Amino acid sequence: MGKVSSVLVNKLVQTDEYKNATNIMLFYPLSDEVNLLPLLKDKTKNFYLPRINGKELECCSYCSGDELCESKFHTQEPTCQACSKQNVDLVIVPALACDKNGYRLGYGGGFYDRFLKDFKRTKICCIPQELVVETVFPEKHDVTMNLIISSK
């Protein structure tokens, strides 16, 4: 996934959505997910990571080197106090697959769909080309992404 991750980071930083954002929420990758953590080297941006609290996703400010702990879902999460998602200009969302209409397939917990339900700013998925499909069979509660960036 290293080469694909590198391609996706390079494509993302060239988008207007990234260039125009100051506060960016990304995710700490699982071993089989795209690794966008090299973005943290961009000192012109403020970064945030998600944390699960009950059934909700929280937004936490993050700087490279800040303390993280492993969650019950085996993701790395910040230990600092949560902040308002209204601080965030751009959310980069993980996905198992995306379709051409901007829908994503997650892990089934609905955390991102609930978090993004009333989020009016930019939502992006960065994903390997082979995980872009015709349809992910979206459900009523699914939130569309503004942009899908593939490795192709």
Label for each model-derived stretch:
Residues 86-91, 100-103, 114-152:
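Surface-exposed, charge/polar-rich loops and edge strands
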Residues 4, 8, 111-112, 144:
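Internal, well-ordered alpha-helical segments in soluble enzyme and binding-protein domains
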Residues 28-30, 51, 95-96, 127-130, ...:
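Short secondary-structure boundary segments
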Residues 54, 80, 96-99, 110-111, ...:
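Short acidic/polar capping segments at secondary-structure boundaries
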Residues 1-84:
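N-terminal active-site beta-alpha-beta segment that forms phosphate/nucleotide-binding
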Residues 41, 106-111:
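Charged helix-capping and loop-helix junction motifs
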Residues 24, 91-92:
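Receiver (REC) domain switch-region micro-motif
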